[in-house]
Amino acid sequence: MQLFDLPLDQLQTYKPEKTAPKDFSEFWKLSLEELAKVQAEPDLQPVDYPADGVKVYRLTYKSFGNARITGWYAVPDKEGPHPAIVKYHGYNASYDGEIHEMVNWALHGYATFGMLVRGQQSSEDTSISPHGHALGWMTKGILDKDTYYYRGVYLDAVRALEVISSFDEVDETRIGVTGGSQGGGLTIAAAALSDIPKAAVADYPYLSNFERAIDVALEQPYLEINSFFRRNGSPETEVQAMKTLSYFDIMNLADRVKVPVLMSIGLIDKVTPPSTVFAAYNHLETKKELKVYRYFGHEYIPAFQTEKLAFFKQHLKG
């Protein structure tokens, strides 16, 4: 195995100090209050999809900054209420064709919404970047916590849960969240910022332990941050940017999660280095389990899909 991060025995105890600023909790309290001022106004448009036993819709709702967020919603074609899953996709990694993932979950009995992250697909992005940014979204608005791109994204993830839980066909007491990479980070963030989810599954979560990530990640998108620092050589700029990131580090949000969590990581993951995933995992203070795949990188891990199905069956159907 090509080892580029810490050995497994060190990873298991890797728990860096949290970097949350003093006003961390207040920031998120006020952010959620801002979100609450926006009426969701969900809109469902039927979609003709070639599968029996499921109904499919294009779901759109209003979120933070009045952005119109959209995605695919698939529901079992039988009487509810049904358990539900909200799924978040990876960084710039969603295509309209991924509708089949939501259909697959619906065929397993879950009303499922796949949120399309603002700006990365067909969801509207109303955030601004007054100081410019590197290619991609990682540094958009990075010099101010109030304008940072992921403030809107995290709140969009929360709003998705609020919308789904309001539907008559959904059992609001049996809703789970899941996603991989960026989607894994959003899974932890949503479970930390909302009391709606009852279970969370995060595949190799991104957006964690930024201070280490920019030193050890070998592939994008963490490296967008490094690129921004190269172009903006001021030490003050780096200090301010890292302070902003601390508000969005899922390592700092982890202890707010109160529901069971299942997580995965491959030990040769060059995108979300294992240490950054363990950093978030080791700060969780809830019932948790981390599946380690020694010979996998940042990729689809077949065995974990079965683990995920079993986990949601236990916590949302059991």
Curated annotation (Swiss-Prot):
InterPro entries linked: AB_hydrolase_fold, AXE1_dom, CE7
Pfam families: AXE1
A GO BP annotation: polysaccharide metabolic process
Subcellular location: Cytoplasm
Broad EC category: hydrolase
Domain of life: Bacteria
Record note on biotechnological use: Used in the pharmaceutical industry for the chemoenzymatic deacetylation of cephalosporins and the synthesis of novel antibiotics.
Keyword set includes Hydrolase: yes
Keyword vocabulary terms for this entry: Carbohydrate metabolism, Cellulose degradation, Cytoplasm, Hydrolase, Polysaccharide degradation, Serine esterase
A single GO molecular function term of this UniProt record: cephalosporin-C deacetylase activity
Mutagenesis or variant effect for residue 181 to A: Loss of activity
GO cellular component, one term: cytoplasm
EC number assigned by the record: 3.1.1.41, 3.1.1.72
Active site residues of this protein: 181 (nucleophile), 269 (charge relay system), 298 (charge relay system)
Annotated positions binding substrate: 91
Catalytic activity: Deacetylation of xylans and xylo-oligosaccharides; cephalosporin C + H2O = deacetylcephalosporin C + acetate + H(+)
Bilayer-crossing regions: none
Subunit structure: Homohexamer.
Function description: Esterase that removed acetyl groups from a number of O-acetylated small substrates, such as acetylated xylose, short xylooligosaccharides and cephalosporin C. Has no activity towards polymeric acetylated xylan. Cannot cleave amide linkages.
Family, as annotated: Belongs to the carbohydrate esterase 7 family.
Name this polypeptide is given: Cephalosporin-C deacetylase
